[in-house]
Amino acid sequence: MDFNKMIPELSVFDINKTKRFYCRLGFKIEYERNDERFVFMSFQDSQFMFEQIHDDGWNTGELSYPLGRGINFSIAVEDVEEFYKLVKTLNFEIYRELTRNKYQVNGTEETQIEFLIQDPNGYLLRFTNW
């Protein structure tokens, strides 16, 4: 396995609940350290690390729900519209419905198709076509 140049490591309330959530979405467990309540997961070209909150962690302040305030993780998927249908059939609550947005990128107008869901810890996941 090759590691991405940037891999977010997210503090979570319950590592087992978090693993179940991400596995249902199609994420793969690459490895885990059960004694440390840590898991490394991947999905297509994205990678995440999750660690259950503990007193010895790198906690910069009080950690309360929702975690990740002000952050959303943009995850490019191969077919965002098909993935959206899958997420709907799994009965995940949609935070923001599938939308098409136009953005200026280096003088060119690009269309991004995206939708958002929220994980059990409060992190926003934005699935996109790019």
Residue ranges and their predicted role:
Residues 6, 35, 67-69, 111:
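Exposed loop/turn and edge beta-strand positions of beta-sandwich/beta-sheet ligand-binding modules
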